Curated annotation (Swiss-Prot):
NCBIfam families: panC (TIGR00018). Catalyzes the condensation of pantoate with beta-alanine in an ATP-dependent reaction via a pantoyl-adenylate intermediate. It is an enzyme of class 6 (ligase). Keywords: ATP-binding, Cytoplasm, Ligase, Nucleotide-binding, Pantothenate biosynthesis. GO terms for cellular component: cytosol. It is found in: Cytoplasm. Homodimer. The active site is at H38. (R)-pantoate binds at Q62, Q156. The keyword ATP-binding applies. The gene is panC. This is Pantothenate synthetase. The reaction proceeds by a bi uni uni bi ping pong mechanism.
Amino acid sequence: MIQTLTDLSALRALVNGWKREGLRVALVPTMGNLHVGHYSLVMLARQYADRVVSSVFVNPTQFGPNEDFACYPRTPEADLRGLEDAGCDALWLPDVDTMYPLGTALATPIHAPGVSDVLEGECRPGHFDGVCTVVARLFNQVQPDVAAFGKKDYQQLAVIRQMVADLAFPIEILGGSIVREADGLAMSSRNQYLSAEERPTSANIHKVLLQMRDSYAVGTPRAQVEDAASHALEQAGFRVDYAVVRLPDLSEPGDGHTGAHVALIAARLGSTRLIDNLEF
């Protein structure tokens, strides 16, 4: 039976009790409105820990002024059932006052230079500062041995890895594979914003990522690969924020096409902003 906690002292008592028994504890942070991708992270965490805590907190500091904080989908009953079925042991439900006791305006910010300043960092200024700030607080509250994040948010995972290394958090960071719909669309809590007409078109993002990989692999110049990807998305009806090929650390690759790379796309379809990536 999953335990639901809203009090920080109760959470710490539970986790400390587990640790006194010599058990490893994992954290799966979420913003709720959960889907199969989130539950796969719980199952991944379970492979590396004896107990799994998932948090649901819609974090106001990672939303920009014109973004969807107020209307972000909240589905608490379904989330609880899904987490229990996935094998989660405890659900941590902090409120804003617990997460930001001095208020969000006085919250001590955390910025991960470099990796958080490009791509999503350019499109959504301050977003990753909010992510780092809330994740660091969750780490301090739960004090896990392991934490799992999805690779769909590739840059977010890179930012968190940098923060953990730089601030010496004694936490192993796991990256969970992207879970996709049958047509290739990466599962996302924001997919429900898509209209019935937009939903089939949205799968073009994954198709374009595959084209980017294949084109780059045969030696097509990176700029040409990126331009072709943007054009294909625009022709399908997207407004493109970026379609790029990067090295795993998100720096720009040189002239060589060997080694590991990642293609990343962010684009809007109607009012819905979608992100996806493909490692190769």
